């Protein structure tokens, strides 16, 4: 008796093309799914064109072509209130982390993303473990990459700044920002109490550059997009405080302004060249609804 593995079994919904278009454009017009989810289905080899898997975004479709879209996904067996799998292949996994969970084990806390993913890999009979290549603070939410083998981990770590070409965060900061956009650059260094502080001149720390763009504002708060040119510890939180508009809910660098009872920082865009296939990988999550609600 052959037992079907729910991890690999796929079922498809079938469509017929009625007007010529590039594949991604056609999928976005005909599937009631977000752009990130459609791209993930493509990259997960969940789309078939004329009975063969297609991953090319600009694959040309002609009138009469048959398109099959997978209805089941590898992460159907995955359930976690803290972690959402956005994309997965044999080399890596992209997840969206909730607040309240560490990126990896630290101290006596057993709740961390690596442990959650390792448990998922065991349940789905994958012979791999999650390898940490970058981190988000416990109370920062958003997109992260985990490698599934040591070789992919090393490729990502050794060439991180060339592989990852766009990382953007969104934050609710205290007060009304004076400028619509700009750049802040200085040196960041930890003191003996592990508090990161900045200096306009070289203080022996690491040079940090953050670009910002205001998306919305009220007298009380501003919704700000941050794009990292460097990725230093606590960079956005320190730079926000330097501008006089700390991230809301920031106990360490904030001013007590805590309208949502959480650190209002979310990693919402992550774009990189796949370390093995070299394909451009672009992921974007919605700005948290609770952030948007403050500006209605």
Regions found by a protein language model. Give the residues of each.
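RNA pseudouridine synthases
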Residues: 1-296
């Amino acid at each position: 008796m052959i037992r079907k593995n729910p991890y690999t079994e796929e079922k498809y919904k079938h469509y017929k093309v009625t007007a010529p278009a590039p594949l991604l454009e056609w999928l976005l017009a005909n599937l009631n799914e977000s752009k990130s989810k459609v791209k993930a289905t493509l990259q997960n080899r969940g789309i078939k064109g004329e009975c063969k898997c297609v991953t090319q975004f600009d694959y040309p479709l002609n009138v009469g072509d048959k398109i099959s879209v997978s209805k089941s996904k590898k992460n159907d067996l995955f359930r976690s209130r803290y972690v959402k799998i956005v994309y997965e292949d044999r080399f890596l996994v992209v997840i969206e982390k909730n607040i309240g969970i560490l990126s990896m084990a630290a101290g006596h806390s057993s709740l961390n993303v690596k442990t959650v993913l390792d448990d998922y890999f065991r349940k789905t009979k994958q012979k791999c473990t999650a390898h940490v290549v970058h981190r988000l603070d416990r109370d920062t939410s958003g997109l992260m990459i985990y490698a599934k083998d040591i070789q992919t981990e090393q490729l990502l770590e050794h060439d991180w700044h060339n592989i990852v070409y766009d990382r953007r965060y969104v934050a609710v900061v205290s007060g009304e920002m004076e400028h619509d956009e700009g750049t802040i650059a200085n040196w960041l260094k930890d003191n003996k109490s592990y508090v990161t502080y900045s200096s306009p001149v070289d203080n022996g720390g690491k040079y940090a550059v953050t670009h910002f763009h205001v998306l919305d504002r009220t007298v009380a708060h501003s919704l700000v997009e941050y794009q990292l040119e460097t990725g230093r510890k606590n960079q956005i939180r320190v730079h926000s405080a330097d501008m006089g508009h700390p991230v809301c809910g920031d106990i360490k660098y904030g001013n007590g302004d805590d309208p949502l009872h959480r650190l209002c920082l979310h990693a919402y865009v992550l774009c990189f060249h796949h370390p093995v296939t070299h394909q451009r990988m672009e992921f974007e999550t919605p700005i948290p609804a609770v952030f948007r609600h403050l500006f209605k």
